[in-house]
Swiss-Prot record:
Family statement: Belongs to the Ninja family.
Main location: nucleus
UniProt name for this protein: Ninja-family protein 2
The entry's keywords: Nucleus
Record region (Disordered): 49-70
UniProt record, GO biological process: signal transduction
Places the protein is found: Nucleus
Organism (species): Zea mays
Domain of life: Eukaryota
A GO cellular component entry from the record: nucleus
InterPro entries, sorted: Ninja_fam, NLS_NINJA_AFP-like, TDBD
Amino acid sequence: MWSPIPGTLMRTSSLPAVIEASGNDDWKKRKEAQSLKRLEVKKKRIERRNSLACNTSKEAAGQSPKEMNANTDKLVSSDETIVSANESHSSGKHLVKGLPPKYQATITSEDSSSAMRKKPNSAFKGTAITEEQNSSSSVPSSGEAISSVTAPSLPLLSLVPITATLGSREDQSILGRAGARANGMGDVERRMMQEMPGVFTKGLSNGSRVEGFLYKYSKGEVRIVCICHGSFLTPSEFVEHAGAGKVDNPLRHIVVSATPNL
């Protein structure tokens, strides 16, 4: 027979409460350990990024001042050598402060010694201030000025005549090319005038005169370029173009001029 279902289900068996509590504790511990590991990994990544960024910034910030200091030291040393050379050149008359003038040096070798002659350039750039010497103690002697110019400063001064000679060579080459081009144009015009002499009409009934150039003159063909229109004409057409009409011998009325028609 069918029996009705009871309203509530009764639990027949279950795990002890101690076992369930211990399982929950283990699961919580595992989750905490995983979260701690993740946090440690994140911290390590952040520390690496920060350390790399700090190293790169330190290197960039450390190299640029060194390079700037090296460049400034080089500039100061070169300025000091040039100022000392300027003082020796002035022979105790003037004391120059500020930027030194440009020099053009020429090197001549005799036996095994070389002498340098320095000439100040007319275009003086900079803010140079000259002051009269009040006492002889303020101006160094010639021996001190010569000793102040060290061996590394000599190549800097030796570069000046090289650039000056290069500039003069370039100017000479440009002038030479321009002159050759002008001479070439003159030769071309002269040759064209020799190959294409000027002609004009003469002795026509109407007395008109038309000028032109003899473009082609060979045994079988003669062509004349009219100046007024620039058209290529035969001798008979050239005479007709002058307004004389048809003539028996047109070459008798065409004269070759000795001077070119310009």
